Amino acid sequence: MYKRQLAVRGLDEIIEYQKYPVKAAEISTKARRSLGIGYIGLAHYLAKNGVKYSDKKALTKVHELTEAFQFYLLKASNKLAIERGKCDYFDRTKYSDGILPIDTYKKDLDEVCSITLKYDWDYLRKSIRDHGLRHSTLSAQMPSESSSIVSNATNGIEPPRGFLSVKKSKKGPLKQIVPQYTTLKNNYTLLWDMPSNDCLLYTSPSPRD
């Protein structure tokens, strides 16, 4: 919760104080205040919880994680809107119509993972209608090749291709082993060992704004 609030606040400050080489870019950026916050290390998260990426139980864990992720990002942006004002282009977003991610996700997911929402979305919807959001978009999931190296995490929302991978860097090839290999190696599902790509198809669309 607090990490997501910190990420939203920190990136909001960057939008305000960074230098813009083109005036049009500054006007558009500050009017939309678009963020692209995602998470890395999903495979490690599942392994720590004793769930294999290819297991259907993983879908439930991802659902729970993603609901919290989206809820607290929106709540943090809403809180900033109350403090500092909503973004200028808020009225151009789906949020201004009271539409939230829980309304727009692909309903086919309910056939493979149907669980009750845990957070107070009705409260959040009303608060967003009343006060708006500080940002027009908040989340985006990316491969995170570089950031996963810095934090020694698995790539974004992807399963690892191997326990040991070799990645390119400016200083040459860099070897990286999956987090907690010694204790969690039996909990990881490697990409090439997955019986099908169903989990990738159902997991990948979930964490989007």
Could you tell me what each predicted segment is?
Residues K3-S204:
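Long, C-terminal-biased catalytic regions of enzyme "large/alpha" subunits
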